[in-house]
Amino acid sequence: MTKKNAFKNSEDMKKYHLSEFNSEATSLTRPSPKSLQHVPCKFFRQGTCTSGKNCIFSHDLELATEKTICKYFQKGNCKFGSKCALEHVLPDGRKVKTRAFAPSTTAMGSSSQNISAAPMANIISNNDKILPMTTMASATASEEKNRIKDEALVIKKEESNVAIPSEVTVAANAFSASTEDVYSIVGDSLSKKASVKDFSDVTGIETIPAYVEATNGSSTVRSPHAKRSLSSISVKSSTSPFSGSKFLSSSSYPHTPEAHLNSNHISPASFGSGIRTRNIFNPESMSLGLKPPILNRSYSASMAPGFSMNTFTATGNLGRPTKSPSVPTSVGSNKSRKFPGINGSTLTATPSSLENLYPLSSRRSVPNLISSLGTSPSTFSSQFLKSTDRTHSFTSKLQSFNPVGTSLLASSLGTSQEDSVNYDIPDEFANEEDFIPNSLQELLTPEELERKMSHGDEAVSSSSASRFMSKVSSNLNSGNPTPYNSYNGTPTSSRFVAFFDRHRQESEKATPPSLNKVSQEPLTATTPKNLGNLTAISETLENGQTLKSNMASSIEKSKTSTEVVASYDTTLDEETQFQMDEA
């Protein structure tokens, strides 16, 4: 059927040509699309429109600045709220801030940075002044240099106000640059220098400015470049910036081991505030046996001797105290050493004080003990003895290295002389391999071993018998025959019971009574020990010969019966094998 015959009249043909689904309809017959020239092109505003003059949207920037008033907001039912793209104008003419005000109106068509940075178009400083983004981006290199010079002058003024020497200030900033952001930026509550000083007066905590205030006229602006200039200061000495400075000779720093423990700790509460405290260990936590905050399990052994001295050794790492010089070996093991303490007191350290470390070091062996749970008592004791052996060697090394540091470390973890335990290992436990079991049989308890030995005979007989073992075959194959009314192993099917009983009765009838008497009544009943004289012995021998002759005659008569029993046993074995093959 052709198209001409498809239409009944001309009106149907017109509808066909005006249809949007007709590909043969011309552009003149189609309805004109809705004009979108009043809608600004978002791609042109961002500089990414590729349509050019053929774009159906408007490329006029003036139209983009003039926002259409939201009619829904005037009615009170705009569901977009502050995200609405139209202007929200109140009845009195005031405009409510919406997304329409986010882009800058002055630099609208040329830059796409203003659109992408609309939520952060303005920067609010500490004195609540709105600074445009362009003022920060238009700073030249010369202005940066002048700013750094001004900040360097401010640094010198700040150093005069701080109670510590200038060399310590440089070292402290290098210290903060080498560690993991120990000093962070001061919050809004400490934004002004006056508030920082008031805070230090109230709490008695020494404060170090995290970054410096750069003064520009009457207003103060916090500049992050001061922190950069401080961290960029290079230390010429590769060993330690504290050597030869006033840091070691200053009276504000301790010169005793105990005072040194209370001087370098930076409490976690001061993180994020730029405040450094003087306490490395809290005395309350030391009395309670708590773990120091900056010591971990792997690092405590290497840092323990270093805390006993009041100097910093020459290493490239400024952020961590290191090991102190070793104690000369000429010091006797039984001699005590005296060190100056706090307020004129004297610290006396003897090798016996190292016993406080035994509970500390025994904690390091807890995972080994836990891993040995569930094993035999012998292996558990060997693990425990091995851990105590390592404890003894560890403490002996610490004793030869620095006896004072080890005793102080033990006292800081809450151990005392009274609570110490002496883990002396006897010589009989020198060979730990003797406690390793050779087989699983040694791991059984005495009750389990006795129970297993009591079932030994049954295990042998049951293992030698088949799963489909019958009464007769179990009596023939087993070393310990059982009566016919009991089973040795899993019994066979019930259809063989009558078969076995019938052939058993036939075999008993065919066997002479003398053979049954010999088999059921052994010669042990007439042993010579029950007789009193030689006459009885001779009579017994005669009876034995008589029995022997009777047995020979009865065996010849019973050949036929034994052949019948053997044939039945062969048949039984074949049927049992067939049962096993089917299973």
UniProtKB/Swiss-Prot annotation:
Keyword Phosphoprotein attributed: no
TM helices/strands, residue ranges: none
Places the protein is found: Cytoplasm
This protein's record includes keyword tRNA-binding: no
GO BP: any one term: protein ubiquitination
Primary localization: cytoplasm
Zinc finger extent (C3H1-type): 35-62, 64-91
Short name of any one Pfam family annotated for the protein: zf-CCCH_4
Function, in words: Responsible for supersensitivity to the spindle poison, isopropyl N-3-chlorophenyl carbamate. Has a role in meiosis.
Protein name: Protein cps3
Species whose genome carries this gene: Schizosaccharomyces pombe (strain 972 / ATCC 24843) (Fission yeast)
